[in-house]
Amino acid sequence: MEFDAKKATQATIQWIRDWFRKNGPDCNAIIGISGGKDSSITAALLVEALGKDRVIGVLMPNTSQSDIDMAQLLVDHLGIRHYTVNIGSCYDALMEEIRNSIGEVSRDSEINLPPRLRMSTLYAIGQSMNGRVANTCNLSEDWVGYSTRYGDAAGDFSPISSFTTAEIRAMGRELGVPEVLIEKVPSDGLSGKTDEDKLGFTYEVLDRYIRTGEIDDPKIKERIDTLHERNLFKLRYMDSFVYEG
């Protein structure tokens, strides 16, 4: 079935309105703005659903950010309130304390700490500004666990987690998001690699597999299936022991 971007966009906007009506009728929406397609399109959906006065964008560079102009373009385009909180000194200080304590820190720890600091920042701002924090993960990322647990995988509500990367782009065009943001190549901003470089396959291949079950390369199928099974725990509540004695 062909994806109907207009229908999906309107349904998502209505869902956001309904969610806030039940979970924060007077609350603002707090969203981290990276300048990538997911945060840009989620922010545009929030503006359509709630009005720009109830959407607060937070830009969170880690000392410097080469594409911070993309994030600024988005908040200027939407006309939303926005704040910049540089997490660089916090990141450096915490990393120094950890290294002083345990010695060597893994590269994965270095890469995953900034998203966790950013999410802590969003919640601090949310509690100070009567807000609910938006999650901006999409279905393609969630499918293979390409997110940081308690970092960008966190949030109070998740508007775009039912949509693949291709579908999100189509919705972005429906919303009039600048094309440069829709087509921006996603990366983690620290390793120097794109998402697709790190995953070992393209989002186009992944999206097709998710929606149709079709894939041409059996090795890539095996890798996607392995990542999916290995990372399902990220989408569940914390596993807990239930004592029935």
Tell me the role of every PLM-derived stretch:
Residues 1-31, 53-56, 63, 72-90, ...:
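ATP/NTP-dependent adenylation/nucleotidyl-transfer catalytic domains that generate, transfer
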Residues 36:
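Conserved G/P- and acidic residue-centered "switch" motifs that form tight phosphate/ATP-binding loops
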Residues 39, 60-62:
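Extended, folded domain segments that form the structural surfaces/walls around functional sites
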Residues 40-43, 68-72:
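Short, surface-exposed alpha-helical segments at coil->helix boundaries
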Residues 44-48:
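Short, well-ordered alpha-helices that flank and scaffold nucleotide-derived cofactor binding pockets
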Residues 116:
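Catalytic-core regions of hydrolytic enzymes
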